[in-house]
Swiss-Prot record:
Keywords: Acyltransferase, Amino-acid biosynthesis, Cytoplasm, Methionine biosynthesis, Transferase. GO terms for biological process: homoserine metabolic process; methionine biosynthetic process. This is Homoserine O-acetyltransferase. HAMAP family: MetX_acyltransf. Its EC number is 2.3.1.31. InterPro entries: AB_hydrolase_1 (IPR000073), AB_hydrolase_fold (IPR029058), HAT_MetX-like (IPR008220). GO terms for molecular function: homoserine O-acetyltransferase activity. The active site is at 159 (nucleophile), 318, 352. Transfers an acetyl group from acetyl-CoA to L-homoserine, forming acetyl-L-homoserine. Homodimer. Substrate binds at residues 228, 353. It is found in: Cytoplasm.
Length: 379
């Protein structure tokens, strides 16, 4: 039976769902190394039609997983995009077959640093090979082909998920009809790389790091918590932090900080340690930093090969992935006469991960784009 909290969030829910796993023989990475075997954790919602042309792949951000919608048994909270996935929602499961998978290099069921090395019976940890955004997409392509799907109706994602969607459009241009890129970029700027580098250095400087070969009993928890705290600062806008925290003191008897914002960041860091792996954090942030489709003329040249319609969404308050990066993508698409709809949502008190949050305006934008099947239709 759903809990009262589940009922609160479950209007139009896909209900109780289960993460599945599939094993492929191998995946050759862009760097030349091979993952053998390749494991992919995934969830699906809705039904694949006979023509197999109603499938939508949704791609998660840095700390996400395959659980995009519905509830796992005993969960109080639904999947990370539950507001937008389900019967009658933007990604309507009465109409579409939604696929969500955990990226390789992550720590939520797909091949990554926590995978057991068959040669010694221990987790690969820091000996796992480097994984790129392109490798993540190539792994997803194996999953899509497993379902017998030749052409996806859409690929959608925000932040790192948006990078995956972009990579799909250039790596497999004939295999998707629509591409939705939210709060993302064609490559990281020096500032974005700098934020991630600080997080990685926090992990590397933890006394328990041990060259990435730590035990579960002695993980680099302090370093990972600091990395998450740094990340959360970049997710929030200045106005949101002023409205939510200001200079308020922390609630309760907290000795380690004098301000509410400090208490919030400490909580985010400590809770993150319980659900994420430090090696995966390093692998995934490096994949983000090394992803590059270029900018300007270089990006225009790369995007000349795409064959799908685009929806690009940016957020005025997002200073981690500022709107100018989305505008660069749009300009390059327009030069190539690619049908593209661009929306910049102006919510001063918003945040980078606004694409994950419930929003009637955002729901309408996604719904209208997906339902407008004629090429060249603009919002």
């Amino acid at each position: 039976m759903p809990t009262s909290e589940q009922n609160e969030f479950s209007h139009g829910s896909v209900g109780v769902v289960y993460t599945q796993s599939i094993r492929f023989e191998s995946l050759t990475l862009e760097g030349g190394e091979t993952i053998t075997p390749l494991e992919i954790a995934y969830e699906t919602y809705g039904t694949l039609n006979e023509k197999k042309d109603n499938a939508i792949l949704v791609c998660h951000a840095l700390s996400g997983d395959a659980h995009a919608a519905g509830f796992h048994e005993g969960d109080k909270r639904p999947g990370w995009w539950d507001y937008y996935i389900g019967p009658g929602k933007s990604f309507d499961t009465n109409r579409y077959f939604i696929i969500s998978s955990n990226v390789i290099g992550g720590c939520k069921g797909s091949s990554g640093p926590l995978t057991i090395n068959g040669k010694n019976g221990k987790p690969f940890q820091s000996t796992f090979p480097f994984v790129s955004i392109g490798d993540m997409v190539n792994a997803q392509e194996k999953l899509i082909s497993h379902f017998g799907i030749h052409k996806l109706f859409a690929v959608a994602g925000g932040s790192m998920g948006g990078m995956q969607a972009l990579q799909w459009s250039v790596a497999y241009p004939d295999r998707l009809k629509n591409c939705i890129v939210m709060a993302s970029s064609s490559e990281h700027s020096a500032q974005q790389i700098a934020f991630n580098e600080v997080g990685r250095q926090a992990i590397l400087s933890d006394p328990n790091w041990n060259q990435g070969l730590y035990t579960q009993e002695n993980r680099p928890s302090k370093g990972l918590a600091l990395a998450r705290m740094m990340g959360h600062i970049t997710y929030l806008s200045d106005e949101m932090m002023r409205e939510k925290f200001g200079r308020k003191p922390p609630k309760g008897n907290i000795q380690s900080t004098d301000f509410a914002v400090g208490s919030y960041l400490i909580y985010q860091g400590e809770s993150f340690v319980d659900r994420f792996d430090a090696n995966s954090y390093i692998y995934v942030t490096k994949a983000l930093d090394h992803f590059s489709l270029g900018t300007g003329k270089e990006l225009t040249k790369v995007l000349a090969k795409v064959r799908c319609r685009f929806l690009v969404v940016a957020y005025t308050s997002d200073w981690l992935y500022p709107p100018y990066q989305s505008e660069e993508i749009v300009k390059s698409l327009e030069v190539n006469a690619v049908p593209v709809s661009f929306v910049e949502l102006n919510n001063p008190a918003g945040r980078h991960d606004s694409f994950l949050l419930p929003s009637e305006q955002q729901d309408s934008i996604l719904r209208d784009f997906l339902s407008s099947t004629d090429e060249g239709v603009f919002l």
